[in-house]
Amino acid sequence: MISAVFGKRRSLSRTLTAGTICAALISGYATMASADDGQGATGEAIIHADDHPGNWMTYGRTYSEQRYSPLDQINRSNVGNLKLAWYLDLDTNRGQEGTPLVIDGVMYATTNWSMMKAVDAATGKLLWSYDPRVPGNIADKGCCDTVNRGAAYWNGKVYFGTFDGRLIALDAKTGKLVWSVNTIPPEAELGKQRSYTVDGAPRIAKGRVIIGNGGSEFGARGFVTAFDAETGKVDWRFFTAPNPKNEPDHTASDSVLMNKAYQTWSPTGAWTRQGGGGTVWDSIVYDPVADLVYLGVGNGSPWNYKYRSEGKGDNLFLGSIVALKPETGEYVWHFQETPMDQWDFTSVQQIMTLDLPINGETRHVIVHAPKNGFFYIIDAKTGEFISGKNYVYVNWASGLDPKTGRPIYNPDALYTLTGKEWYGIPGDLGGHNFAAMAFSPKTGLVYIPAQQVPFLYTNQVGGFTPHPDSWNLGLDMNKVGIPDSPEAKQAFVKDLKGWIVAWDPQKQAEAWRVDHKGPWNGGILATGGDLLFQGLANGEFHAYDATNGSDLFHFAADSGIIAPPVTYLANGKQYVAVEVGWGGIYPFFLGGLARTSGWTVNHSRIIAFSLDGKSGPLPKQNDQGFLPVKPPAQFDSKRTDNGYFQFQTYCAACHGDNAEGAGVLPDLRWSGSIRHEDAFYNVVGRGALTAYGMDRFDGNMNPTEIEDIRQFLIKRANETYQREVDARKNADGIPEQLP
């Protein structure tokens, strides 16, 4: 039961190996092979992906990452008849962000905790499963859930990253290990924290598997590495932040970092100890037209610009798109979208290429909707800024310089320089995050899963003091994120919004939008049937008219959806599939406030639809979550303030601001361990639940500080118990976190 609570179930399905089902697998492949043969998929096959429209061979279906499929068996006229064809329960009830690949009727899906599954795409039958056995204590090395966004396929092998930093190649037919490498170089200059995780999908370009990493919230120096797809040997590496001593790393990035980037940093800021950030945790794109690899580069480490770089310089290559040669990793060009970043405005969001008519000529461009709220059009071959316009409301900048694309800052938004709080829109979660956008060549529109989640930026008082195994942002963790007063919280809740924004890139203007109940919804798929598919945080899966946003179909998936759908052919029939499971930093940190998007209890699955689906409805499940347990009546009020400080420093990022959970991980107010000092210390201090992702913290806090947290939790349980009990009596379920 405890393992299920922490979203990592130890079950029979978790123990399946390639060997136990090899015979079934081989017979299954014999029946699934088709004329749409992609089993030998390499770069040429992916370049000509539209010759194999029934497959989904790479992360964005094509190298352009447009997430458009020409399939049109399912279209506007018949999508209302869509039915559930099959579902497959997963063994991790946490956030699922993966894009499944589908090659000749076989689906390859990565799930939370870096597991890989091969599934019969027509029936949902599990063919093989691979568990890389990521250690449970790695969970607290990442900011934003133990998610995995997908895999890559090349020449009969499937590749994926693991949360503990490995890159793994498996035989696609058998699921057997071909090779495994550690992507984090032990000898490199990476900062004191060296807190790295891998949750993004690798990309393959010219026989090289390219993967990045995350970790800037703790302390990391960003880089990507290209590995030989056949052998796993390192081909090249490119760092996205300078060496703190401006010395060579003996990598492809040495020249540009030493001669161009280093000069944009203070030589003595905290970045020299923390790594500087700039991790590439999502978007890596190969463009065969320009023959370039594009990197979307992340935020600074620490976030605080004054502490990080003494308030000096643009800090290359933070918040940038960087173009490299695929064979060598040699730098070609860069465009920095957010100089002087202090808002966590990453540029790792999906990079898309397309051919766009501009001023009477067709240009090959990058279109990009990063966190900072602006929609950029950039020349894909040269990095020249063409145009930019905000696709959501922003208050940190009044616009972009029309010639250079540099932001025109609101002086008040430079909170690390003013020393004053800043209520930023968008906040750190961005106007657009990891949820994939799509483009339809039929409508000419880009469809952005946009959102508004403000953030209260407050400087850390007394200078920057990093903590091991904790977020090191240079901000006051007791005040950031969510306002304290009831009135401010009411206003904050009203500011939580989510939409599909249909954006016309030629006009740099919104065409129309679809309003959602709140933010943190799933990615978008566009199809030749003039449809958009998207799952929502409230557990509904929708199909919309791509021309005007009309809602044409919806299905109750019972759990929030943050992953993007895919579509494919199996036995000549079109299917639409998506991974189901809500998670990530929004419900982790915002906790009770995240419930405004709609309450669901996680039951992670893959679900697939067809026009003649016969699976029937999903099994009914508990929709109220764990019932509150009446807490102990007594607590030491003298200890709760320090308990709050320790909780916000070490616990809130997973268990919710002010100790209110959103249903993904345990809500500690109702944990039985808070009733007993020894039991609580065994979990928090000694790591009794390390195998399930709850690491030990006796190296970070002493027993007195851990007990202070327990006293704080008892206080919060008493303050909120009756409200939570009453809420479960209401038809609307559990309310948002409000006094």
Curated annotation (Swiss-Prot):
UniProt xrefs under InterPro entries: Cyt_c-like_dom, Cyt_c-like_dom_sf, PQQ_b-propeller_rpt, PQQ_MeOH/EtOH_DH, PQQ_rpt_dom, Quinoprotein_ADH-like_sf, Quinoprotein_DH_CS
Location of this chain's protein in the cell: Cell membrane
Keyword terms: Calcium, Cell membrane, Disulfide bond, Electron transport, Heme, Iron, Membrane, Metal-binding, Oxidoreductase, PQQ, Respiratory chain, Signal, Transport
GO cellular component: outer membrane-bounded periplasmic space; plasma membrane
UniProt remark on cofactor binding: Binds 1 PQQ group per subunit.
Enzyme class: oxidoreductase
Disulfide bonds: C143-C144
Cited NCBIfam families: PQQ_enz_alc_DH (TIGR03075)
Protein name in UniProt: Alcohol dehydrogenase (quinone), dehydrogenase subunit
